[in-house]
Amino acid sequence: METKTIQLNPRSKNITEGKSRAPNRSMYYAMGYEEADFKKPMIGVANGHSTITPCNSGLQKLADAAIAGIEEAGGNAQVFGTPTISDGMAMGTEGMKYSLVSREVISDCIETCVQGQWMDGVLVIGGCDKNMPGGLMGMLRANVPAIYVYGGTILPGSYKGKDLNIVSVFEAVGENAAGRMSDEDLLQIERRAIPGTGSCGGMYTANTMSSAFEALGISLPYSSTMANPHDEKMNSARESAKVLVEAIKKDIKPRDLVTKKAIENAVAVIMATGGSTNAVLHFLAIAHAAGVDWTIDDFERVRQRTPVLCDLKPSGKYLAVDLHRAGGIPQVMKMLLAAGLLHGDCLTITGQTIAEVLKDVPEAPRADQDVIRPISNPMYAQGHLAILKGNLSPEGCVAKITGLKNPVMTGPARVFDDEQSALAAILAGKIKAGDVMVLRYLGPKGGPGMPEMLAPTGALIGAGLGESVGLITDGRFSGGTWGMVVGHVAPEAAAGGNIAFINEGDSITIDSKQLLLQLNISDAELEKRKVGWKAPAPRYNRGVQAKFAFNASSASKGAVLDDY
């Protein structure tokens, strides 16, 4: 793409120039602006700082650095807030149903402020999971020059010589309930797992999305794996601000960057790093916001050609800080580019192409580390996020399939219409090896809000059942989940999807080799069960949950609210 130089205040001049805008300027003067400032770009800083969660409680210093960078580069910083939900704190409660809703609220906040205030650009700062897609969706809707600053990953905790993170605590709950861990060890893990600020440390959802944003070119190189407490994260925020001012001069906008080829690059990086199932849902929504033709089947196309190169949690050994020390996302991208698995001609926010950004990165990983494997000797030959179909999910669903000892299982259904009763059954020892748990009426409309299921899956793993019990749901999974799990089943139960018609004890097959999710009954029996079915009454009749349930599209389309 050819870039062009334009005036620095192409939008804000609508409220700062001319005699008729004297009242507008008067309000700016009240905040300390001077006449010369009205020729400068007005740049929004969407600040996700919050003391709700450690993921976001370290963001203010990044916002301060970004503000300084904007001013040093000749811009005016206009700060506004965006909300967050702590997935880790809300997990396993009714509050988790607000997590995906917050993605939409965040994107609405950014679009509203940028458009309502005629901002010339926007720098978005976020930490917890939904901050990431929500931020980018808002950037794409507003489509002014924009850059994303990720808050940074958390450092690992430690107990008895073992690295810990938040998922360690969820799994410890299951171990304790199964009699495999003492109360004292559970207490010490609880206290030591999270030593400070930053987002959850494995290749969970926040780190997955930040890595993908770096691959998209909407964030700076190396920025996605930096730790929040480290000075380089603050320096990166300041540099991001200066790069954004240059992008305003060149009129580089989010939709120039987030193209179909760029999304293919991002998904290839997600596969290569062993990223979260949530990335499937979020990139369907991001593509929708960008106006890009991208379907759930495109993930499978990229998966089949992309190896898993990184040994990262939840199913691997290392954390994001280890990936950073090993060369970060640029190292992974250069390996994929050299193998012909990345589009090098995609533009980045720096004004350079992907190939130009990666020019000086070596094609092979360093020999003194084992976080990133050589492309000739990958962790797995194909990606880990598979799209399964079958009579239980004709629109598709998402499974993590790498690292499983048994990639195929058939077992009796154990049916639950809510998460809490499923968790109680696991902790009470009522779920046995070979069972296939079904958690339904938890989709975008049915939940509503499509909650994540880390509490049940963590309990299964802690109880030693992670490899021997299957779990399928029309809800979602945390990025920290691993095991024989299948989520995003679509159509969902509340929309009359076939998952609604599973009976206790029915035979279900999960086949990650044939990409199949099947209820083993006849078509005639399935149709018989549908007779007389009615959608359940809405769980909410007012507020954001009611709006979400009424408007949300299928998970196979990203669970977006504006698919009209």
Curated annotation (Swiss-Prot):
What's an example Gene Ontology biological process for this entry?
Answer: isoleucine biosynthetic process
This protein's record includes keyword Mitochondrion: no
Q: In which pathway does it act?
A: Amino-acid biosynthesis; L-isoleucine biosynthesis; L-isoleucine from 2-oxobutanoate: step 3/4; Amino-acid biosynthesis; L-valine biosynthesis; L-valine from pyruvate: step 3/4
Task: Provide the binding site for Mg(2+).
Answer: 87, 129-130, 452
Q: Which Pfam families match?
A: ILV_EDD_C, ILVD_EDD_N
EC number of the protein? 4.2.1.9
Active-site feature positions: 478 (proton acceptor)
The record's section on SUPFAM superfamilies has: IlvD/EDD N-terminal domain-like (SSF143975), LeuD/IlvD-like (SSF52016)
Q: Where does [2Fe-2S] cluster bind?
A: 55, 128, 200
The record lists the catalysed reaction(s) as: (2R)-2,3-dihydroxy-3-methylbutanoate = 3-methyl-2-oxobutanoate + H2O; (2R,3R)-2,3-dihydroxy-3-methylpentanoate = (S)-3-methyl-2-oxopentanoate + H2O
Select a single GO molecular function from the record's annotations and give it: 2 iron, 2 sulfur cluster binding
Q: How is the cofactor bound?
A: Binds 1 [2Fe-2S] cluster per subunit. This cluster acts as a Lewis acid cofactor.
Q: Which residues carry this modification: N6-carboxylysine?
A: 130
Q: Which UniProt keywords apply?
A: 2Fe-2S, Amino-acid biosynthesis, Branched-chain amino acid biosynthesis, Iron, Iron-sulfur, Lyase, Magnesium, Metal-binding
Write down the PANTHER family for this protein, in alphabetical order.
DIHYDROXY-ACID DEHYDRATASE DAD, DIHYDROXY-ACID DEHYDRATASE, MITOCHONDRIAL
Oligomer and partners: Homodimer.
Q: What does this protein do?
A: Functions in the biosynthesis of branched-chain amino acids. Catalyzes the dehydration of (2R,3R)-2,3-dihydroxy-3-methylpentanoate (2,3-dihydroxy-3-methylvalerate) into 2-oxo-3-methylpentanoate (2-oxo-3-methylvalerate) and of (2R)-2,3-dihydroxy-3-methylbutanoate (2,3-dihydroxyisovalerate) into 2-oxo-3-methylbutanoate (2-oxoisovalerate), the penultimate precursor to L-isoleucine and L-valine, respectively.
Name under which the protein is recorded: Dihydroxy-acid dehydratase
Question: Which taxonomic lineage does the organism of this UniProt entry have?
Answer: Bacteria, Pseudomonadati, Pseudomonadota, Betaproteobacteria, Burkholderiales
Q: Which gene encodes it?
A: ilvD
